[in-house]
Structure formats: C-alpha cells, structure tokens
C-alpha cells in the first residue's frame, strides 16, 4: 500500500505518527501547500525511508493526479479542510485509487427553494459517482 496524505496539519501529522509505528504500508507521501508543514510532520520520522514529502495544491485536480502517478500511490487520505474534498475525491476517481476521509462533500441548500426542498446532502456526489 502506497499512501498519499494530503494535509500536514494536526490530522495529517497525527496520521504520520500513528503510521510510523505500523508496518501495513510500503510508503507514505505527506503533501501540503506549505512545505514547512510537511517538514514538521516528517520531523517525527527522520531517517525512516518509508516517508517522503511533497508540495501540492489541494484545489488542483491535475496536480493531485500527477502526484498520485509520480509516487505510484494506491490510497489517498484527505486530511485537509472540507472545502477541498471534491478536488481530492475527483483526483482519486480520475487516477483510479482509493479515497479515505474523515468527512465528505459539504451539503448545499436547494438553489431555488432552500427552505422547502432538500439540496445536495452530505456525500451525495460521491455516492452518485460510486454507483
């Protein structure tokens, strides 16, 4: 298993610390828009060749797909703000890799009758694409 963790904040850094104690994966790439956050997350696993870092714009599907392909990633863990769920999900779908997250796409109200009809509910788009 080759994992891309998108987001090197609190959740991504915690995922690195937990994964470092395990042997279920071959490699983990920790990626964030801010290289300093990547360095901070990787500081706890210095010398472990199973970890590497990269810079990524989580709003750019093409750059996420390129990173997935460059590192032979098989699974992506989304550890960023929910606003970036859909670009990361779309990149995984395009690249044909598994997507893991602690959330789903944000709900949106009905465009014409927000108080009368349901709009797009949490996760609707992902479930629709998966069927």
What are these regions (language model features)?
Residues 82-131:
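Glycine-/Pro-rich loop/turn segments that contact NAD(P) or position catalytic residues
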Residues 19:
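Aromatic pocket-lining residues of Rossmann-like dinucleotide-binding sites
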Residues 12-15:
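N-terminal Rossmann-fold NAD(P) dinucleotide-binding loop
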Residues 33-37:
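Helix N-cap at the beta1-alpha1 junction of Rossmann-like dinucleotide-binding domains, i.e.
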């Amino acid at each position: 298993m080759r994992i891309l963790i998108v987001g090197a904040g609190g959740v991504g850094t915690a995922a690195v610390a937990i994964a470092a104690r395990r042997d279920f994966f071959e490699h983990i790439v920790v990626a964030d828009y801010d290289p300093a956050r990547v360095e901070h997350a990787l500081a706890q696993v210095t010398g472990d060749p199973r970890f590497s870092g990269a810079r990524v714009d989580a709003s750019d599907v093409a750059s996420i797909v390129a990173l997935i392909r460059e590192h032979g990633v098989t699974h992506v863990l989304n550890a960023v703000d929910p606003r970036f769920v859909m670009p990361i999900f779309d990149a995984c779908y395009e690249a044909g890799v598994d997507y893991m997250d602690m959330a789903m796409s944000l709900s949106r109200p009905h465009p014409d009758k927000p108080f009368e009809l349901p709009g797009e509910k949490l996760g609707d788009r992902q479930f629709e694409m998966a069927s």
